[in-house]
Amino acid sequence: MNVSRLALAVVEPHIEVLNPFDGSIVGTVADVCASEVPHLLETGRSGARACAALPRHRRASILEQAALNIERDAKAFARLIVDEAGKTLKQAEKEVKRCVNTLKLSAEEAKRNAGEIVPFDAYEGAESRQGWFTREPLGLIVAITPYNDPLNLVAHKLGPAIAGGNAVILKPSELAPLSALKLVSYLVAAGLPETVVTVATGGAELGKALVAARDVRMISFTGGFVTGEQIARTAGLKKLAMDLGGNAPVIVMGDCNLDAAVDSCVSGAFWAAGQNCIGTQRLLIHAPIYEAFRERFVNQAQALVVGNPLLANTDIGPMITQQAAQNAEQMVNEALQQGATLLCGHRRQGNCYGATVLENVDHSSRIWRNEAFAPVVVLQVFETFDEAIALANEPEYALHAGIFTNDLSTAMSAARRIEAGGVMINDSSDFRFDAMPFGGSKYGSLGREGVRFAYEEMTQPKVVCLNVLG
């Protein structure tokens, strides 16, 4: 049973996918219950055999063809992302381009990363032996994806998994599953056997049953820390790869290009309505330029247009649900009650929440310690570089960080000392290239994504050793 076949039909029970901006019904998907998991696993086992049997050139050609077809139909994909996830049209168009690139990178990985020669004769006592290791599929992988990048984050699970010869049971966010379903349909149209990727749309109980299933060899999860902890407790002896969130700092030194820093940080803070795990949340600004930076940053933030994501001039679309917008509002209210100063924003209308900038934030507040996942940014002054590093490293969640400086020694010192999975120099924390390793430190993640690195997580080495006798 491939649940993706049911997804666009009205079935009972079903989930209505709502447009975050106007509340209209974008589509319906099956609400798959936990009792269906044995059927999903049966399909997954069959798919694992089918994908492992595909030669590498065939896996690559399927991924390449799907990428070309998505590129051809980019406008339709972008519109679907806008409708179900609320991204602005320009943001959705960028996500489609990244998805195409992710699939192309995965196709290349299928052909390139096949193993290595093992130099057995480098060790005394093994001179008569020759051999190598190959990279073999794990088997069946469960991938659980969020709503904020409903197409490209799915591609980051499926592309490397298929390249490595695995099958996947994909559970996309029930808030925005339609882009995932469309992507899978394009993979099947490109020649992927239907059993290789099974899309199962449903709620938390379905997810728990999939995570606990013994036939599953790996869980690849992108989402919140609390859910990640629950998965780790439930999964048992399975491989885990998790991107759990961040609270990204960006240090702005007094010697930087101020205009470039402001422009980049505005984009990094408010892209996708702040619903971005590497979005800039804390701006740490050198005292000599604090007032100048604050004035320019606040002016740009106030100029951002909030509203209908289909309009060309919209900068910030809606948050995914009204509850998400209310949570952001509540987090800011708490900070204000603890003495923070509001510089702009903090206006909510339905699911829309305007660009919000705070200063004088208490470091015990949630907005400082936790991931906001909203268009909210904190400005914090510092006097010395050592102080900036200490401030950057305070939270438990660390994916990306950034620093703006014209001094190479300062930049490299920050790269060494900031606790994060990536340090962007003269960029906001929000920069990501889909080929680079992606993940965090502390409680930010387990393992790494990025096509090559996900491929290695989703495969395992197998040694072949030949003893040449005589």
Swiss-Prot record:
- The EC designation for this entry is 1.2.1.-
Pfam name, any one: Aldedh
Q: Which reaction does it catalyse?
A: L-aspartate 4-semialdehyde + NAD(+) + H2O = L-aspartate + NADH + 2 H(+)
Q: Which cysteines are joined by disulfide bonds?
A: none
What InterPro entries does UniProt report for this protein, alphabetically? Ald_DH/histidinol_DH, Ald_DH_C, Ald_DH_N, Aldehyde_DH_dom, ALDH-related_metabolic_enz
Quick one: which residues bind NAD(+)?
T145, K171, G245, E371
**What are the catalytic residues?**
D243, C277
Gene3D superfamilies, A to Z: Aldehyde Dehydrogenase, Chain A, domain 1, Aldehyde Dehydrogenase, Chain A, domain 2
The signal peptide, as residue positions, is none
Q: What induces it?
A: Up-regulated upon growth on canavanine.
- Gene Ontology molecular function: any one: lactaldehyde dehydrogenase (NAD+) activity
| Keyword tags | NAD, Oxidoreductase
Record function comment: Dehydrogenase involved in the degradation of canavanine, the delta-oxa-analog of arginine, allowing growth on canavanine as sole nitrogen and carbon source. Probably catalyzes the NAD(+)-dependent oxidation of L-aspartate-semialdehyde to L-aspartate.
The entry assigns this protein to a family as follows: Belongs to the aldehyde dehydrogenase family.
Spell out the protein name for this chain: Aspartate-semialdehyde dehydrogenase 1
Q: Which organism is it from?
A: Pseudomonas canavaninivorans
